[in-house]
Amino acid sequence: GCIAWTMMEYKEHRFTLHNFESIPEKFDEKTIGDFFFSHHLHHMFANQEYRIVIPLWHICKVIIPTFVVLYFLFGTVVALDFNAGLGLAQLFYDSMHFWFHFGGDFKIKFFQDLKEKHMRHHYRDKTKDFGVTSSFWDYVFDTI
């Protein structure tokens, strides 16, 4: 689940939240529209605390259907294990993202490099550096 999360994070961030062509004509504030605009407000006002973490309802829209599909395909253990990984990765993402914006520098180079990469995404080039918790997919898709 944790590994799958990195791909979901990259895909969502790059192809949904930064793809202006994907904006539906009519938004339902309970669906992607609210999250899409919230993300762009986060870019405009990057240091507002309430725009840093992903809303719980958006997380549930991913975890609940994933659990149901995995439960019917592979059973309870796989569904629980995979979703536990997704949940842990989400907590890691929210914690790291919050720290990137409001914490100091990291003593561990890996985390400091991720923070600097994320700040580049915000302030230099919004078409690069989509991975927040990992640079792996940015290297794979040449967006580093």
What annotation goes with each model-predicted range?
Residues 1-6:
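Loop-to-helix transition at the N-terminal end of transmembrane alpha-helices
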Residues 7-144:
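Membrane-embedded catalytic scaffold of the fatty acid hydroxylase/desaturase
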